[in-house]
Amino acid sequence: MVKPSKILEKIKKRTEPVAEPVVEEESDEEIIEQEGSEEEEEIVEEESEEEEEEVEEENKNIEENKKDQSIYTKKRVLFTSTRGIGSKYRHLMADLISLIPHSKKEDKIDDRKTLSLINETCEMKSCNYAILFDVRKGTDCFLWMAKTPLGPTVKFHITNVHTLDELQMTGNCLKGSRPFLHFDKSFDSEVHLQLIKELITQIYSTPKGHVKSKPFFDHVFSFFYQDGRIWFRNYQISDQEFKKDSLLTEIGPRMIMHIDKIFSDGFGGSVLYSNPNYVSPNNTRSDHKLSKANKYIKRKYQKGKAEERQKISFIEPSEVDTVFDN
């Protein structure tokens, strides 16, 4: 038998209300602090994400710049010449090699008919551009500038050449320094001049960060277009004492380039431009010989006319002159 006291205890336990868990109410300051901390965490996370994105973009840009610079700093210009080059043009080539630090010299070419083989030589020597001094008959020098192997190629006839040793100018520049390139306004007037300007810029401009180059500019390569010819000059940038302006002092060398033809490929291909005002040195020599021959013919003709006039003007002696001879 269950005691009634135990039954009453069970009934009381069932009827008693269950005590609810006590929840501590947070104060307004604690709520504000929690909200502020959450906002700060969100801001920090956003800033960290933005920084990560910026770092990734910078790394991408650095990699792209490294690729571009690696391609640009590997730019090389191959210098070569044909057999029979004279001392004057050989010294000119040596001067240009000393002024262009990203240049590379190659042996002479035996056969002029196989100029397209220079493209293979450039590929073997890992050169992007080529300059050829093609001397014919010991006096005529043709300068070929080419972007190998796809082109274009520009052929010039060089005249009025003066080397550094010949000029002995007061200007001077450090070997390996980078040059400024200055072009006349007339280079933007015609299409073929714009092409020549771009090719000269790519060949003569020293790439930034090149191994053999110095990280500053102290001379200027100037190209002027006048009388259908390109005039080349090299000046030193020297600062005058007690003056803000800079002074240009000529260094040398000097040369005048007459445009002959522009080809589509490297040392060959179709002719993109042919200068109608260009006269080859062979034609000038033949004209000079013809003028000399014409002078000789005129002199002989005048001599024959003089003899005829003398015969006509000759007066035979009269009988009066011989009266007193007996």
Curated annotation (Swiss-Prot):
GO cellular component terms listed in the entry, alphabetical order: nucleolus
Record's subcellular location: Nucleus, Nucleolus
Q: Name one GO molecular function term.
A: RNA binding
Where are stretches of biased composition, namely Basic and acidic residues? 1-17
Asked if the keyword Nucleus belongs to this entry, the reply reads yes
Biased composition regions of type Acidic residues, renumbered to the chain:
22-57
| GO terms under biological process | ribosomal large subunit assembly; rRNA processing
- Limits of the Brix domain: 75-268
Q: Where is this region: Disordered?
A: 1-66
Output the InterPro entries linked to this UniProt entry: Brix (IPR007109), BRX1 (IPR026532)
Report the function annotation for this chain: Required for biogenesis of the 60S ribosomal subunit.
The protein in question is named: Ribosome biogenesis protein BRX1 homolog
